């Protein structure tokens, strides 16, 4: 029997991973043990097992067909996990590139993953900009508030298309400054 597969997305700096991890910890205390999987890490595991990459940066240099195959295999691997326990997939709905927005979950991944729910973590663009500027542990491209807002809009559009293709519900969770516990509670309410 398949357990729940939930995809959690958000732009860099919105706090999606933090909100998800805190929700997983609380749910675990309640006896609901989700496995949290980073999609990029799952892809790297596949690439590494096949001797195609020894670090995550090398994956970007693989030819597109190989990348697609690795994406598909990672999706299949996560779907297999869902036979054992519920899974929360931490990934990006879209990836902003110099040539435009790249879908984080193209059709061949969605077919394998078949999520039950897509969650988009958001907040105001100016809050994200300030978080990025104050986070010295990460090196991120400098963006304007308008650019961040556009990226969040594209994430919503992509999430809805993922829902159309799979029948997954789409939930927007707001992670406002100083109110992370509210975002965690909102996420928990749909994961139970």
Curated annotation (Swiss-Prot):
Single annotated GO MF: adenylate kinase activity
Identify the main location: cytoplasm
Q: What is its EC number?
A: 2.7.4.3
Q: Where in the cell is it found?
A: Cytoplasm
Could you list this entry's UniProt keywords, alphabetically sorted: ATP-binding, Cytoplasm, Kinase, Nucleotide-binding, Transferase
Give me the residues that bind ATP, please: 10-18
Give me the reactions it catalyses: AMP + ATP = 2 ADP
One cellular component term (GO) for this entry is:
cytoplasm
EC main class here is transferase
Record family assignment: Belongs to the archaeal adenylate kinase family.
* Quaternary organization: Monomer.
Protein name, UniProt field: Adenylate kinase
- Quick one: which gene encodes this? adkA
